Amino acid sequence: MNRSAIMIAVGMLAGSLYAQDAAGLVADVKNSYNGVKRNILEAAEEMPEDGYSFTPGPGSRSFGGWVGHVADAQANSCGGINGAPKQLGAAQMTSKADLLAALKTSFEMCDQAYEGTTAENYLSGVQSFRGQTPRIASLYGNFGHDQECYGSMAVYIRAKSLVPPSTARQGQGRGKGKGK
């Protein structure tokens, strides 16, 4: 076997290993997003209408404010990944129905962004509030922001004597908690 053939084989092997790593990274961010998406949607649906105006103290964002914030942030972030950042105006909405509709619209935009990400394009540049960033970085940024927001929303749910969705599922084979 000549050196050229060996170098070509090594190059092909390295390329396929790189693609597997990229595919794993893309699968991980999609899986992570789907988990927090479920938590946020279930939390927004669980909180009763009168809980949407609940704040734990002066100067705090209301529960509905958190839902609106997630919707607007996702519309901007995932819209940027999709090539058209948007503002839904959800921060000004107050009714549960309007906020849930905006939240679902923002998740549709994010579904498109996450599903459109592949091992081939995950490093491509997309527009974000930081300027041009790699697509995968914007997706992980969106996921991380969603996690932070869900953490705050879960506290509001507990303050209303309800059980956050992620905790409720712990007694159903996920985690070690008892859930309700």
Summary of predicted features, one role per range:
Residues 1-7:
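Bacterial N-terminal signal peptides that target proteins for export
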Residues 15-19:
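Sec/Tat signal peptide C-region and signal peptidase I cleavage site
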Residues 20-27:
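Cleaved targeting-peptide boundary
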Residues 30-34, 38-41, 49-89, 128-180:
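Short, contiguous alpha-helical
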Residues 39, 43-44, 78, 109-114:
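Well-ordered alpha-helical scaffold segments within catalytic/enzyme domains
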Residues 94-128, 133-150:
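Acidic/histidine-rich alpha-helical segments that form the ligand environment
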